[in-house]
């Protein structure tokens, strides 16, 4: 298997800029790496499966290229004949070969990205999202180090990991792939001798062979705690070191321009998590699972601290008779239980031993598992602040005795890590659907007030009842009433949250998120439940943030009015003021897209932000937006930097939280260097959006009006297809892998909210996932072409020139089209036509697919016209080449998937057929690099 047959990517013109030359050189190396890995995989397939299978792979690939290029009918028939002639066993092995090539190509691409990052850094070439570049812009704008330090005192940048089931790879596969990446990296960094190069080749072959002989698929369904463990692995790979390192690097850059004696920079970068706390639609996230999650998180960070202290103790071999130490350091050393005579004159080592002993005692008190043991008994730390105080003693002693360079080593990283991660590691959000809270409150209220029917009350009556309950000092829950299992389950979760605050600190669970929030009562119900466990007090204090999540188009439109009334409500406003006058609001990208389509979802989210900013400014409350974005464009995905910069003025304001989901977590954070760059991008974009254009000039009124009209037209086109076309549900279930996705064992959560086939009840992830697999990516573009055509027809005086102006002048519109450009480049109407053939009703197939095909062509034509491009991704040549490189290995997987689906749905009970389908889903996901 080789890339020798791929088209050449020679430059269209001679490059002039240094960065262009570097990009071309890096691209040439990328091709070399892909050829190397492709050759090794091909040799592995030939050795393990025989020359006949290898030749079959090549025949399928070549025929697929002809079909993709021009929908060659002869190629289609030839492909069908080849696939029909294969046994199930051959099919499975063919799928594995193409899938693994996609996996290996991804590794090569990731290494190429690292290579280019290093080249830019070495050449001091700035780029979007590079923190140094952003700081230079701030300096040029007259924003000095002191102003930046003040900004970061209240800033918050928080990536939030979720367990959304879009990562189809097993951890075993990811571990092997990381070894391949490490070997490629070493070849890049080190000039190898001939023997070393041969050994490196052999190691690569060994890893690829191990991959070939490793199961791509999970045999059993993941549990919630499995998902927690998978999420925690990224702390080992990246977060535990790179989060504190990034804050320290920023601190150093500010010191270069300011006072080196200035106070330390606030730790503005905080990790969040939903894994083990997200109960919306997942019955397996219980109070006990949440407790287990918190213990696992704490165990991981405690083990990290103990390992660092162990190494720090060996490093700080400073003898008391050779260097002065502070009195407080001597006191700390004297408290150490370490009685070894070898360390009697080494106060720093004794002090570290004492800290180590106290930390292990703390882990034991928190019921957290650790593998290391102390040299003696210590007293547990009451809080993380006590641990910080002891580490500060070490720091001050080193600084006061002219050992600043030592203080800035491992100790500095550890002190920053403790500040960032505490004893809890990540801030765990708890989330539940508003309907569950409503049923819980209804049962409690009806039991406490005989004759009441809470569910029959109107919104105003509920608000009055709930605010009275918030002020009441009596308990609503009675020990003499037997409540339903659902109600007890909810109450137990809130009790577990209160326990977490007592054990790990208030940062352990700082947010309670309300999914499908539709009114004020949804938020007040949660406040009352929190009061029952002591996290909200009748006096108006709250130990936790109550966060509404607005998800549907209708709810986004109502969000600012709801928050306006909430902030005007005295009893709720007291709770907000007790939280520093900061109110978080979460915006859902996934369900709004499924509800109203890509264009309308993006526009309603943007308008909701504008309106929320205005409301919060009137109430003098700080707005923190939490963006619930997925990996795919159909669920709000796309480049993070562009997304943050395109926010309306005032929407970032120094604080932002963003979900990182599924396959996006591994692509961004499984490699420390890539992870550092992605964290830097988030920090830089937040800084730039907040300080450099905090109140960027509002878009012109005619821009907003045009976007309103385009959105309305796109909404009608999308809803007309998805919700108003007879037979669409049947078409969707027949032409996609929606049924088969549920068999993948990639997550603990069910795929649908209810056991129906209705689109309304389907979760956004399998909805988007299914359209990606058949290569239509419909949620990422449908309706735009029709909207533009109709808008131009209605506005002949403005027409296309006005839309081109919109694209040139307005970051929001530019980002919207850029994301569509990427999605459409990965789509293939030729491949999609083969999935349409799976619909048994020919009239239905032609009616719906014909409509989709026309919209696809219209969308591409109008998009290219507005962007001034001749082809998709013309403005992003690296991504264009990446996508084009993938098709020869991605398309065959789609062809095989169609044939396997046809066979499986013909009531073939063969387990190998289902396994083959699952393998194609895995391979296509890898080839697309984002799925749901």
From Swiss-Prot:
Gene Ontology BP term (one): tricarboxylic acid cycle
Example GO molecular function: phosphoenolpyruvate carboxylase activity
Its EC number(s): 4.1.1.31
Reactions accelerated catalytically: oxaloacetate + phosphate = phosphoenolpyruvate + hydrogencarbonate
Active site (catalytic residues): 164, 594
SUPFAM superfamilies xrefs: Phosphoenolpyruvate/pyruvate domain
GO cellular component: cytosol
Cofactor list: Mg(2+)
Keywords assigned: Carbon dioxide fixation, Lyase, Magnesium
Keyword Transcription in record: no
Pfam families reported for this sequence: PEPcase (PF00311)
Main function: Forms oxaloacetate, a four-carbon dicarboxylic acid source for the tricarboxylic acid cycle.
Family the UniProt entry places it in: Belongs to the PEPCase type 1 family.
Annotated PANTHER family: PHOSPHOENOLPYRUVATE CARBOXYLASE (PTHR30523:SF6)
Name of the protein described by the UniProt record: Phosphoenolpyruvate carboxylase
Organism, scientific name: Bradyrhizobium diazoefficiens (strain JCM 10833 / BCRC 13528 / IAM 13628 / NBRC 14792 / USDA 110)
Gene (UniProt): ppc
